[in-house]
Amino acid sequence: MPAAAAGPMGEMSPAGYHAGMSTQIDDPQIAPFSKFRDLTADIHVTMLTTRRADGLLHSRPMGTRAIESDGALWFFTADDSGKVNEIYHDQMVNVSYIKPGDQVYVSVAGKASLSRDRAKIRELWTPVLKTWFSEGVDDPNLALLRVDIVAIDYWEGPGKIVSLLKFAKSAVTGTPSKVGEYGTIVPPPKT
């Protein structure tokens, strides 16, 4: 997969997304995330939403660096960025994944925290990050944002053509049409 990039302050879309994803689904702590990983496998840029001090919501694009088997999402960030300050005041965030061509929409409610764990930074590091962190893994401003998933809502449609045909059939027959799948995933409490 080619490397891609987005914005400043660690808000990026690096190569190597979803590194370390587990395919094991028999563990009750892991199974809920199987559907989530399937839905987001090809979505590389997300929107992370935090709450500002004045109460307004603030969203910015981020690149998911990893989705752990326990549902933790990892993002690189600058530890002096505005989002970090917002998270210190309110840890609840939303992460949105959208793939409009396939009619996939995922909304993740989670609890965010900042990590300066150098071992984890080295594990998730990719050279494209030097664009924002010129000193590499030793950049003193480099940190990780961890989002622990609280709940996931998703909508998955059959695609544009099938959706249009179902809408047309519904208009002609006057009966509502189920155009896609909606679901909520609430992971079990961590043990």
What do the PLM-derived regions correspond to, one by one?
Residues M1-P8:
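Compositionally biased low-complexity segments, especially N-terminal hydrophobic helices
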Residues M9-D27, D138-T191:
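C-terminal edge-of-domain segments
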Residues P14-M47:
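Active-site-proximal "nucleotidyltransferase
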Residues D38-A53, V93-Y97:
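A short, Trp-centered hydrophobic/proline-enriched beta-strand micro-motif
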Residues G55-M62:
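A positional/architectural concept
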Residues S69-W74:
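Short active-site oxyanion
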Residues F76-A78:
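Short His-Asn-centered micro-motif
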Residues K83-I149:
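Short, structured beta-strand-loop surface elements
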